[in-house]
């Protein structure tokens, strides 16, 4: 059952081969058996089965939503009524939200059944899921490796078939990089496409929710339910609802040859994504994927994104600045961790935050406070925002000669747990290919396309596909065509 796609699972429900309750029980047993992966931080079987029973009733009455009865796991950055909402932090270890995030509410309205909350880097700050107050997540493909971050619990859950789908968030690569490391498909939509209401904030001008699943087709189904305008989110974009499945299985150009479904597609290859720092085994997997695209009829076009190397310093000025502001609300007064002993109000603030936040979060708060301080704002934050606009302009220049841009999602495969913990800068460098996409607000996704070599032969590689604003449906079409021609996305870790 757990090897089936969302479409196949829904067909099984409609054919009464199984019930939503039986499906939920199946996944709950798998989650319990795989506790060593540490992919989930909160599971409540009673709540899950109650939702499944409601889905069965809706299916029986013919009132079911398009995703009715299908299980999903939610990254613990989305607040959920009934389940704890911790953002991977001691600060919120016992926080119970009185409402559902819009993403959670929309998926529930479509009939999906919540399996639980997945582990994550604290407040979404990290690239390895080692920064969680609840311990690191293990990569199902190689349990000595990280699953990526910050949506590492979600990527591990989907890869290990503990859930057929999961929600994630992406601020600088936190859907795409863990999708790459865990061999699953994940998409970060255009900024503003998916509501941030009820998403615990890290960097408000960058945060964006999106789906993670086995395939592009599954992600398209999920995005149909997740995306859309939300008046409760000031950054939500007012656009007509779309069917993100509408191009799947179709030729890129009208009247196209079935043997060359992507004839006419121009794929831009940035020179900056294939230079020094890209591991040989990752390069080999990406090159092989690009050859598949050529066989499907696509044309490869050289493009340039000259400010790529500046995306790391720009991001690590802007994101910490916004984080320092967003996280100032956690003071031990209204909600969150409060120190047990303190002398006065100021001491309570200090001790509550010192005890509640982990080291990486503290590091970014300090950096953010510094770059926003008097005398440094113009030199750092203002300059970073100017370069951010140039990065966005570079992408628009590139899109004049191509339809999508491709390259690696990460310069390496997943590294060993603990390998980069003492050097945060090395961790930051791993996001070199994803940060600029986030800074520009563009949609990007990662698709499994192979594995590393030698000692890394069990560690997946992801191909990043970048589209222009609001081109998600076309990106999903491009990814789906690749997945129809290959089987990387259906391969499973040993023992699954």
Swiss-Prot record:
Pfam families: Amidase
Key words of the record: ATP-binding, Ligase, Nucleotide-binding, Protein biosynthesis
Active site residues of this protein: 75 (charge relay system), 150 (charge relay system), 174 (acyl-ester intermediate)
Superkingdom per UniProt: Bacteria
GO CC terms of this entry: glutamyl-tRNA(Gln) amidotransferase complex
InterPro entries (UniProt xref): Amidase, Amidase_CS, Amidase_dom, AS_sf, GatA
Transmembrane parts of this sequence: none
GO biological process, one term: translation
GO molecular function: ATP binding; glutaminyl-tRNA synthase (glutamine-hydrolyzing) activity
Catalytic reaction annotation: L-glutamyl-tRNA(Gln) + L-glutamine + ATP + H2O = L-glutaminyl-tRNA(Gln) + L-glutamate + ADP + phosphate + H(+)
EC nos: 6.3.5.7
Biological role: Allows the formation of correctly charged Gln-tRNA(Gln) through the transamidation of misacylated Glu-tRNA(Gln) in organisms which lack glutaminyl-tRNA synthetase. The reaction takes place in the presence of glutamine and ATP through an activated gamma-phospho-Glu-tRNA(Gln).
HAMAP family: GatA
Family indicated by similarity: Belongs to the amidase family. GatA subfamily.
Record's subunit section: Heterotrimer of A, B and C subunits.
Protein name from the UniProt record: Glutamyl-tRNA(Gln) amidotransferase subunit A
Lineage: Bacteria, Pseudomonadati, Pseudomonadota, Betaproteobacteria, Burkholderiales
Gene name tied to this protein: gatA
